[in-house]
Amino acid sequence: MKYEFGAEKPEQFRQYWPGQYDFFSYMEYACAIPQPLFAITTRKADGKPTSTSTPGAAFRGDKGGFFAILAGLCQHTHTYENLRRDGAFCVNFLSKRYYDALIRTVEHNGPAEDEFAVGGFIEETARTVAVPRIAERFLTLECKCERIEDLSGEGLTAMVIGRVATWRWPRIMRKASRIKNIRGTVFSISFTRLRI
């Protein structure tokens, strides 16, 4: 059986929490487009590290640079405030074993909470931006904000485009040249001419 839906939310999609379909399109739940597991890290105004997930991202570039495009970042969050204030973030790719830890950081993200401690993550100093990296990641993109735009014009979510200033992964991965399964995450890498 095949299903086809339009832009309007069908009746059968019930709301699980207040405002669910204000902040997220019903299509994000219906389409279930797979995404790699990653955490966006920033710093709160008081200097505490933050870690959060975002509904989706794309990573693209051309000869003018490589970019992390975060779509659907809620504008009422401290992560959004941090990005606007500091203009920087890290994208930390994590293996599936860190899923529960990442969810804990989302559930316990009050102003006074150290989200790295809540998730059990080790804070690592980034090389080119003044926000932390997660030591447990297998790949980090250190990004400087290029643009922040209201996604729908409703003042609810934003699209953030960050220029990747530095990327880093563990030494063990530097010899990869074909599809690998690294700590539970499958992706393709090819370094035929790159010397690291």
Predicted regions span which residues?
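Basic, polyanion-binding surface patches
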Residues: M1-I196
